[in-house]
A protein has these predicted regions:
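Structural preference for beta-rich elements and adjacent junctions enriched in aromatics
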Residues: 1-210
Length: 210
């Protein structure tokens, strides 16, 4: 469990996550990182019935043209992504955060839905969640940006309160755009041997501790 922290105090946030599990972002699908790859890490923990995520991302050029929530943020510029699946079922969530303060929320009923989407058998619009199911804040720092995101127990169908012993699969990823029109640099905390963020067999199984 994380120590108490003030969500508006980035120094206190960093201190609370000091002893939390930290997951580095990488490019496991590539023998060597791309020249434009920039590092980052993600810390995770829980407190007050909320699963908390802190990301610290190096970035040479923050950019996004996002203007509203639930746009295809990964096509519009820099984005940080959370993939979360409580172990009680097959449902999982794909949550995006853009440096502009916009979000994308998708609820997948099962692991095969991504294949049905890519084959045109289902529509992304049917997966959108309009009401906020997580909170987040971002800040720009010299050489990058930071994200604090909180997913309440209710999003996972868990009772509020003590989350110790709860288990979920988790993966965190990003699209890092350079602003020069080139393709974004992708990275993930998961050891994806194939570049597919939805490969749940590569995600990290987390057990939340007291």
């Amino acid at each position: 469990m994380l120590a108490p922290f003030d969500k508006s105090d980035w120094g206190a946030i960093a201190a609370a996550f000091e002893s939390a599990l930290k997951l580095p972002l990488g490019q496991a699908w590539s023998p060597e990182p791309e020249k434009k790859f920039r590092p980052g890490f993600v810390g995770v923990g829980w407190r007050d019935g909320i699963f908390w995520v802190r990301a610290v991302l190096d970035d040479d050029c923050l950019t996004t043209s996002a203007t509203a929530d639930n746009q295809n943020l990964w096509t519009l510029g820099d984005v940080f992504e959370l993939f979360l699946r409580p172990m009680e079922g097959e449902v999982y969530y794909e949550l995006h955060v853009a440096p502009s303060g916009h979000r994308l929320q998708l609820r997948f009923p099962d692991a095969d839905m991504i294949n049905r989407l890519r084959e045109g058998k289902d529509r992304r619009e049917d997966l959108l969640v309009d009401e906020p199911i997580f909170t987040f804040t971002t800040r720009t720092v010299p050489g990058g940006w930071e994200i604090l995101a909180g997913v309440p127990a209710a999003t996972f169908g868990w009772p509020a309160g003590d989350l110790s012993g709860r288990e979920l699969l988790a993966s965190f990823s990003r699209y890092d755009y350079s602003g020069d029109g080139s393709a974004p640099v992708l990275s993930s905390t998961s050891a994806h041997t194939i570049m597919n963020y939805h490969r749940q067999e590569d995600w990290k199984r987390l057990t939340l501790r007291a």
